[in-house]
Amino acid sequence: MRTLAIDIGGTKIALAIVEEGTIIQRYQIATPVVQDVTKFVQAILEKVTEWLPSIDYVGVSTTGYVTPEGITSINPETLNFPVPFPLAQTLEQLTNKPVSILNDAQAAAWFEFVQLKNPSLNMAFITVSTGVGGGIIIDGKLHKGNSGLAGHIGHMSVAIEGPLCGCGQRGCVESMASGNAIQKESEATFTETMSNVELFKQAAFNPKAEAIINRSVQAVATLCCNLKACLDLDIIVLGGGIGLAEGYLERLNKAIQSRPSVFHIPVTPAHGDYDACLLGAAFQFKE
Protein backbone atom coordinates (compact mmCIF):
# COMPACT_ATOMS: atom_id res chain seq x y z
CA MET A 1 0.00 0.00 0.00
CA ARG A 2 1.40 3.36 -1.06
CA THR A 3 0.16 6.58 0.49
CA LEU A 4 0.72 10.13 -0.62
CA ALA A 5 1.39 11.86 2.71
CA ILE A 6 0.85 15.61 2.87
CA ASP A 7 1.83 17.61 5.97
CA ILE A 8 0.56 21.19 5.87
CA GLY A 9 2.27 23.70 8.14
CA GLY A 10 2.18 27.44 8.54
CA THR A 11 5.27 28.02 6.39
CA LYS A 12 5.87 24.81 4.43
CA ILE A 13 4.19 21.70 3.07
CA ALA A 14 6.00 18.37 3.10
CA LEU A 15 4.94 15.67 0.65
CA ALA A 16 6.07 12.06 0.51
CA ILE A 17 5.31 8.63 -0.83
CA VAL A 18 5.10 6.37 2.23
CA GLU A 19 5.13 2.59 1.91
CA GLU A 20 5.11 0.26 4.93
CA GLY A 21 6.06 3.13 7.23
CA THR A 22 9.04 4.18 5.11
CA ILE A 23 9.41 7.41 3.15
CA ILE A 24 10.24 6.40 -0.44
CA GLN A 25 10.28 9.85 -2.05
CA ARG A 26 9.78 13.32 -0.68
CA TYR A 27 9.31 16.92 -1.75
CA GLN A 28 8.79 20.22 0.05
CA ILE A 29 7.18 23.49 -1.00
CA ALA A 30 6.32 26.78 0.66
CA THR A 31 2.72 26.89 1.87
CA PRO A 32 0.74 28.52 -0.97
CA VAL A 33 -0.64 31.94 -0.07
CA VAL A 34 -4.01 31.49 -1.77
CA GLN A 35 -7.53 31.54 -0.38
CA ASP A 36 -9.19 29.38 -3.04
CA VAL A 37 -9.17 25.72 -2.04
CA THR A 38 -8.94 24.40 -5.61
CA LYS A 39 -5.93 26.60 -6.39
CA PHE A 40 -4.36 25.57 -3.06
CA VAL A 41 -4.68 21.87 -3.88
CA GLN A 42 -3.52 22.36 -7.46
CA ALA A 43 -0.40 24.15 -6.20
CA ILE A 44 0.40 21.09 -4.10
CA LEU A 45 -0.39 18.41 -6.67
CA GLU A 46 1.43 20.04 -9.58
CA LYS A 47 4.72 19.19 -7.88
CA VAL A 48 3.95 15.48 -7.54
CA THR A 49 1.75 14.71 -10.54
CA GLU A 50 3.99 11.83 -11.62
CA TRP A 51 3.46 10.14 -8.23
CA LEU A 52 -0.32 9.86 -8.45
CA PRO A 53 -0.66 6.74 -10.66
CA SER A 54 1.25 4.67 -8.09
CA ILE A 55 -0.70 5.99 -5.07
CA ASP A 56 -3.47 4.05 -3.29
CA TYR A 57 -4.44 6.61 -0.63
CA VAL A 58 -3.90 10.25 0.28
CA GLY A 59 -3.29 11.08 3.95
CA VAL A 60 -3.22 14.68 5.14
CA SER A 61 -2.01 16.15 8.40
CA THR A 62 -2.62 19.85 8.82
CA THR A 63 -2.35 22.63 11.31
CA GLY A 64 -5.78 23.79 12.42
CA TYR A 65 -9.06 22.36 13.67
CA VAL A 66 -10.36 19.60 11.39
CA THR A 67 -14.11 18.95 11.11
CA PRO A 68 -16.13 17.04 8.48
CA GLU A 69 -16.83 20.37 6.77
CA GLY A 70 -13.15 21.31 6.46
CA ILE A 71 -10.28 23.03 8.25
CA THR A 72 -10.70 25.96 10.63
CA SER A 73 -7.75 28.05 11.78
CA ILE A 74 -7.91 28.51 15.54
CA ASN A 75 -4.98 30.93 15.29
CA PRO A 76 -5.01 32.74 11.93
CA GLU A 77 -1.48 33.98 12.64
CA THR A 78 -0.25 30.41 12.12
CA LEU A 79 -2.27 29.57 9.01
CA ASN A 80 -5.19 31.63 7.76
CA PHE A 81 -7.69 29.52 5.80
CA PRO A 82 -11.20 30.66 4.87
CA VAL A 83 -13.65 28.86 7.18
CA PRO A 84 -14.29 26.03 6.65
CA PHE A 85 -11.62 25.04 4.11
CA PRO A 86 -12.83 21.82 2.35
CA LEU A 87 -9.37 20.47 1.61
CA ALA A 88 -10.08 16.72 1.86
CA GLN A 89 -13.14 16.93 -0.37
CA THR A 90 -11.21 18.86 -3.02
CA LEU A 91 -8.27 16.45 -2.88
CA GLU A 92 -10.64 13.52 -3.46
CA GLN A 93 -12.14 15.27 -6.48
CA LEU A 94 -8.78 16.11 -8.05
CA THR A 95 -6.96 12.83 -7.32
CA ASN A 96 -9.83 10.31 -7.42
CA LYS A 97 -8.20 8.64 -4.40
CA PRO A 98 -9.52 7.93 -0.88
CA VAL A 99 -8.48 10.82 1.38
CA SER A 100 -8.17 10.91 5.17
CA ILE A 101 -7.31 14.08 7.10
CA LEU A 102 -6.32 14.80 10.69
CA ASN A 103 -4.87 17.66 12.64
CA ASP A 104 -1.10 17.37 12.27
CA ALA A 105 -0.30 16.76 15.94
CA GLN A 106 -3.13 14.24 16.28
CA ALA A 107 -1.72 12.36 13.29
CA ALA A 108 1.79 12.47 14.76
CA ALA A 109 0.47 11.25 18.12
CA TRP A 110 -0.99 8.16 16.48
CA PHE A 111 2.24 7.47 14.58
CA GLU A 112 4.33 7.86 17.73
CA PHE A 113 1.96 5.64 19.73
CA VAL A 114 2.32 2.85 17.16
CA GLN A 115 6.10 3.04 17.66
CA LEU A 116 5.92 2.58 21.45
CA LYS A 117 7.31 -0.68 22.80
CA ASN A 118 4.59 -0.64 25.47
CA PRO A 119 1.20 -0.03 23.79
CA SER A 120 -0.58 0.13 27.15
CA LEU A 121 0.86 3.58 27.86
CA ASN A 122 -1.31 6.67 27.83
CA MET A 123 0.59 9.43 26.07
CA ALA A 124 0.53 12.84 24.46
CA PHE A 125 2.48 14.16 21.52
CA ILE A 126 3.46 17.83 21.66
CA THR A 127 4.84 19.69 18.67
CA VAL A 128 6.62 22.99 19.26
CA SER A 129 7.05 24.45 15.81
CA THR A 130 5.59 27.51 14.05
CA GLY A 131 2.73 26.96 16.49
CA VAL A 132 2.18 24.53 19.38
CA GLY A 133 -0.11 21.54 19.01
CA GLY A 134 -0.79 18.16 20.49
CA GLY A 135 -2.45 14.80 20.22
CA ILE A 136 -3.63 12.51 23.02
CA ILE A 137 -3.77 8.71 23.16
CA ILE A 138 -5.93 7.18 25.91
CA ASP A 139 -6.43 3.41 26.27
CA GLY A 140 -4.87 2.78 22.89
CA LYS A 141 -7.13 5.18 21.00
CA LEU A 142 -6.59 8.64 19.56
CA HIS A 143 -8.79 10.96 21.59
CA LYS A 144 -10.31 13.54 19.25
CA GLY A 145 -13.36 14.50 21.31
CA ASN A 146 -16.89 15.01 20.03
CA SER A 147 -15.93 17.74 17.58
CA GLY A 148 -12.27 16.97 16.90
CA LEU A 149 -10.93 19.75 19.12
CA ALA A 150 -9.17 17.48 21.65
CA GLY A 151 -5.41 17.89 21.59
CA HIS A 152 -5.30 21.58 20.73
CA ILE A 153 -3.24 22.02 23.87
CA GLY A 154 -1.27 24.94 22.46
CA HIS A 155 -4.34 26.99 23.35
CA MET A 156 -4.34 26.07 27.02
CA SER A 157 -3.52 29.24 28.94
CA VAL A 158 -0.49 29.04 31.23
CA ALA A 159 -0.33 32.77 32.08
CA ILE A 160 -3.63 34.58 32.53
CA GLU A 161 -1.91 37.97 32.21
CA GLY A 162 0.25 36.71 29.35
CA PRO A 163 0.45 37.90 25.74
CA LEU A 164 -2.62 37.95 23.53
CA CYS A 165 -2.78 34.85 21.35
CA GLY A 166 -4.10 34.88 17.80
CA CYS A 167 -6.97 32.66 19.00
CA GLY A 168 -8.24 35.51 21.21
CA GLN A 169 -7.14 34.18 24.61
CA ARG A 170 -4.27 35.44 26.74
CA GLY A 171 -1.25 33.45 27.81
CA CYS A 172 -1.75 30.43 25.56
CA VAL A 173 1.26 28.13 25.35
CA GLU A 174 1.40 28.93 21.63
CA SER A 175 1.68 32.66 22.35
CA MET A 176 4.70 32.07 24.60
CA ALA A 177 6.49 28.98 23.33
CA SER A 178 6.02 28.65 19.57
CA GLY A 179 8.49 29.52 16.86
CA ASN A 180 6.40 32.58 16.05
CA ALA A 181 6.40 33.64 19.72
CA ILE A 182 10.16 33.16 20.01
CA GLN A 183 10.69 35.21 16.85
CA LYS A 184 8.50 38.05 18.16
CA GLU A 185 10.34 38.11 21.48
CA SER A 186 13.68 38.05 19.68
CA GLU A 187 12.69 40.99 17.48
CA ALA A 188 11.63 42.94 20.56
CA THR A 189 14.90 42.15 22.36
CA PHE A 190 17.61 42.51 19.71
CA THR A 191 18.22 45.39 17.31
CA GLU A 192 19.46 43.05 14.59
CA THR A 193 17.16 40.49 12.98
CA MET A 194 18.01 36.99 14.19
CA SER A 195 16.55 33.67 13.03
CA ASN A 196 15.46 31.12 15.61
CA VAL A 197 18.31 28.88 14.46
CA GLU A 198 20.80 31.64 15.21
CA LEU A 199 19.08 32.38 18.53
CA PHE A 200 19.73 28.82 19.72
CA LYS A 201 23.37 29.15 18.69
CA GLN A 202 23.66 32.44 20.59
CA ALA A 203 22.09 31.02 23.76
CA ALA A 204 25.34 29.37 24.88
CA PHE A 205 26.96 32.76 25.49
CA ASN A 206 24.13 35.30 25.29
CA PRO A 207 21.92 35.48 28.42
CA LYS A 208 19.18 37.36 26.55
CA ALA A 209 18.93 34.63 23.94
CA GLU A 210 18.87 31.98 26.66
CA ALA A 211 16.09 33.86 28.48
CA ILE A 212 13.90 33.85 25.35
CA ILE A 213 14.36 30.10 24.91
CA ASN A 214 13.76 29.51 28.62
CA ARG A 215 10.45 31.39 28.41
CA SER A 216 9.33 28.90 25.78
CA VAL A 217 10.63 25.95 27.79
CA GLN A 218 8.87 27.02 30.99
CA ALA A 219 5.55 27.40 29.18
CA VAL A 220 5.83 23.90 27.69
CA ALA A 221 6.96 22.48 31.06
CA THR A 222 3.83 23.92 32.67
CA LEU A 223 1.76 22.37 29.89
CA CYS A 224 3.38 18.96 30.48
CA CYS A 225 2.73 19.12 34.22
CA ASN A 226 -0.87 20.20 33.60
CA LEU A 227 -1.39 17.24 31.27
CA LYS A 228 0.01 14.93 33.95
CA ALA A 229 -2.36 16.42 36.52
CA CYS A 230 -5.37 16.31 34.21
CA LEU A 231 -4.92 12.95 32.47
CA ASP A 232 -2.25 11.13 34.52
CA LEU A 233 -0.35 10.34 31.32
CA ASP A 234 2.60 7.94 31.32
CA ILE A 235 4.78 9.66 28.74
CA ILE A 236 4.99 12.71 26.48
CA VAL A 237 6.67 12.65 23.08
CA LEU A 238 8.13 15.92 21.81
CA GLY A 239 8.48 17.00 18.20
CA GLY A 240 8.61 20.07 15.97
CA GLY A 241 11.40 22.31 14.76
CA ILE A 242 11.71 24.11 18.11
CA GLY A 243 11.01 21.06 20.27
CA LEU A 244 13.77 19.09 18.54
CA ALA A 245 16.24 21.98 18.43
CA GLU A 246 19.55 21.25 20.14
CA GLY A 247 19.25 21.51 23.91
CA TYR A 248 15.50 22.17 24.05
CA LEU A 249 14.48 18.72 25.33
CA GLU A 250 17.21 18.75 27.98
CA ARG A 251 16.04 22.16 29.19
CA LEU A 252 12.44 20.94 29.23
CA ASN A 253 13.08 17.80 31.29
CA LYS A 254 15.15 19.85 33.73
CA ALA A 255 12.31 22.36 34.08
CA ILE A 256 9.79 19.58 34.73
CA GLN A 257 12.06 18.03 37.35
CA SER A 258 12.11 21.39 39.18
CA ARG A 259 8.33 21.16 39.71
CA PRO A 260 6.64 19.13 42.49
CA SER A 261 7.33 15.43 41.96
CA VAL A 262 3.66 14.46 41.69
CA PHE A 263 3.57 16.27 38.32
CA HIS A 264 6.76 14.78 36.89
CA ILE A 265 6.44 13.01 33.55
CA PRO A 266 9.13 11.73 31.17
CA VAL A 267 9.45 13.53 27.84
CA THR A 268 11.19 11.78 24.95
CA PRO A 269 12.04 12.89 21.39
CA ALA A 270 9.78 11.90 18.52
CA HIS A 271 10.64 8.56 16.92
CA GLY A 272 9.73 10.13 13.59
CA ASP A 273 12.08 13.03 14.28
CA TYR A 274 11.08 16.02 12.13
CA ASP A 275 8.83 13.75 10.01
CA ALA A 276 6.43 12.65 12.76
CA CYS A 277 3.52 14.66 11.34
CA LEU A 278 4.30 13.58 7.77
CA LEU A 279 4.45 9.90 8.73
CA GLY A 280 1.35 10.40 10.85
CA ALA A 281 -0.49 11.55 7.74
CA ALA A 282 0.16 8.13 6.19
CA PHE A 283 -0.50 6.16 9.38
CA GLN A 284 -4.15 7.26 9.48
CA PHE A 285 -4.80 4.14 7.41
CA LYS A 286 -3.26 1.89 10.09
CA GLU A 287 -5.91 1.19 12.72
Curated annotation (Swiss-Prot):
Top enzyme class: transferase
Molecular function as annotated in GO: ATP binding; N-acylmannosamine kinase activity; zinc ion binding
Residue sites binding Zn(2+) per the record: 155, 165, 167, 172
SUPFAM superfamilies in UniProt: Actin-like ATPase domain
Entry EC number(s): 2.7.1.60
A Pfam entry, by short name: ROK
Membrane-spanning segments: none
BP-aspect Gene Ontology terms: N-acetylneuraminate catabolic process
Signal peptide annotation: none
Role played: Catalyzes the phosphorylation of N-acetylmannosamine (ManNAc) to ManNAc-6-P.
HAMAP family membership: ManNAc_kinase
Xref: NCBIfam families: PRK05082.1
Family: Belongs to the ROK (NagC/XylR) family. NanK subfamily.
Name listed for the protein in its UniProt record: N-acetylmannosamine kinase
Lineage per the UniProt record: Bacteria, Pseudomonadati, Pseudomonadota, Gammaproteobacteria, Vibrionales
